[in-house]
Regions:
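C-terminal output helix
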Residues: 107-116, 120
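Alpha4 helix (beta4-alpha4-beta5 surface) of REC/receiver domains from two-component response regulators
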Residues: 64, 85-102
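Active-site residues of response regulator receiver
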Residues: 10, 54, 82
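Two-component/phosphorelay signaling modules centered on CheY-like receiver
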Residues: 13-31
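Receiver (REC) domain active-site loop signature in two-component systems and cognate sites
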Residues: 57
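Helix N-cap/capping motif at the beta->alpha junctions
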Residues: 11, 31-40, 62
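Active-site beta3 strand of CheY-like receiver
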Residues: 46-52
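Conserved phosphotransfer cores of two-component systems
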Residues: 43-46, 69-75, 96-97
Length: 122
């Protein structure tokens, strides 16, 4: 059986590589270095199950990226994974039902694995 696909968007290459290496046996991880690339990857891979995005990125931030994802893919389960606690963004994400979780970097492997597994059964 094929591994579930997750998309991880982050403007820092080291974070992309780390998440990909961490979960290479659990998920098929598709990475993108920008929100624009993330939207392209979603168009190319409609079977992506979970979308994880950094918050602070140039051009389009993570929440705006997730808003774009949800416009065309309301069924996608989205999460923010960030080094910044921004309560207003977190509240907007939850109140508008844009995000499933708001997680902090550095991530804990077991916590992130469990969260993605929860997202897959939604």
């Amino acid at each position: 059986m094929a591994l579930p696909k997750i998309l991880y968007v982050d403007d820092e290459e080291i974070n992309l590589e780390l998440l990909e290496l961490t979960f290479m046996n659990d998920f098929q991880v598709i990475t993108a270095e920008s929100a624009e690339e993330g939207l392209r990857q979603l168009a190319l891979n409609p079977d992506i199950h979970v979308v994880i995005s950094d918050l602070k990125m140039p051009v389009m931030n993570g929440l705006d990226f997730i808003k774009e994802v949800k416009k065309n893919n309301p069924e996608k389960v989205c999460m923010l994974l960030t080094g910044f606690m921004e309560s207003e963004i977190m509240l907007e994400g939850f109140n508008k039902e844009l995000i499933f979780r708001y997680l902090m970097k550095p991530w804990d492997r077991d916590e992130l694995l469990e969260t993605v597994q929860e997202a897959l059964i939604r």
